[in-house]
Amino acid sequence: MIDRICISINNRCNMACKYCHFHEKASSICGQDMDVFKILDNVVYSIEKNNIHVFKIGFVGNGEPLLDYEKFKEYVLYISKYLDDGRIAAYTISNGLLWDREKLEFFKLHRVNMGISIDGIEEVHNEYRCNTHSRVMEAIQLYKDINGKYPSMNCTVGESVIEHADETIAFFSEFENRITFSRMIGKYGISLGVFNDFLRKASSSLNVRTGGYDCTMYGGMCGAGMNNIFYSNGNVYICGNCVDMEPLGTSDMPLADFENLSYDFDRKHCYKETICE
């Protein structure tokens, strides 16, 4: 049963990170209109019809979601009853450059988890993420001032992080929060084996997101075609890494239409990487 979706509410970003694999998918990513309210209606219908205890929505995808903050606010307010009741758990991941007190207090009020992308130490982060380390650290401190704790953090793991593994782990140990390490894919990608070796090392001292049927990019098993789908460009895809492949359908289709997907592959490996070998 579908109980988790990701919605790419826009296809634009205020950064041009060197390793972003969406650069390689640019011809498949467009600004086609998508009725997010219809998607949310379909989610609410499925929650009520199937008595789903918690439905997870990630407002994440091909760009920086806070570039469309006013629309994002409307989406959050539209499902606020379900957020307040805990029936929907919503989150987003941001580069932090647009964080301010008003935005962070709004998301805190409506129980939307804010994750921030930071690639560890200044040298590595600035190499790939447009020399923004100091600004991201300021955003992290602002979040802590408002929420009384540090935000969850996302670190993309490429060769530079591997080369500075001990320094990276030491950097994140200062925050005492949950860290998602994401395997770099595409042109600058690293192998699954190298990534998993790093995860094992990091997990010995950090609270690292791992395990379960989720995504091999985050250290779990590939959950493509099981209980989650990805919305972008007015379409539905098996996952966010597959927006340059044939869509499963259009974004206005009910969730029930995607319930009977069946894919036979080794889920220790990424679905797309498996079929593209």
How should each PLM-predicted stretch be described?
Residues 2-38:
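Canonical Radical SAM [4Fe-4S] cluster-binding loop centered on the CxxxCxxC motif
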Residues 17, 116, 234:
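Conserved, mostly hydrophobic/aromatic
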Residues 39-60, 68-183:
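Radical SAM/AdoMet-radical enzyme domain recognition
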Residues 63:
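Acidic beta-to-alpha connecting loop that harbors the catalytic carboxylate
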Residues 108, 168, 198-218:
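Hydrophobic, well-ordered secondary-structure segments
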Residues 124-128, 190, 248:
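Short, charged, surface-exposed secondary-structure boundary motifs
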Residues 178-197, 211-221, 246:
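Flexible glycine/acidic-rich beta-alpha junction loops that bind and position SAM and/or redox cofactors
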Residues 207-277:
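Accessory C-terminal segments flanking Radical SAM cores
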